[in-house]
Amino acid sequence: MEIRTATPADWPLIWPFLRDIVAAGETYTWPRDVTEEQARKLWMPPAPARTVVAVAPDGAVLGSAKLAPNQGGPGDHVANASFMVAPAAAGRGVGRALAAHVLDAARADGYRAMQFNAVVATNTRAVELWRSLGFEVIGRVPEGFRHPARGYVDLLVMHRRLD
């Protein structure tokens, strides 16, 4: 698997799994009916943000990640990242590989920390992955997410230093 900067030509390969993940309504705070145009603007924003893809040897896009400042101005030294793995590639280490790549990129860009603002507490695979990579839960929004099957569940704020 290769991880590289996403190009506009990758979008048609990202959109189908991104659309399905968001429409499921279980892990992202985006509108479940997000349009392709809205999603492209959110997922592939201009610099200083960057988007990467994990690509199989056959050219299939297995997953994608976005790295950006968590806040602007005096808060721009803390990074934020988002990750989506194609369901067909789940359990194959794609998320971990994307995370390692993004953490390295954030360090290289001079970020001092990384923060995830809204990790759905019932997304246990993600929570376990982030904990294994040194992230800690530093905050909790009680019932901050409407899960389609589980009702109101907590959102976690997760953080780790990069220096």
Model-flagged regions — what are they?
Residues 106-119:
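Conserved GNAT acetyl-CoA-binding A-motif
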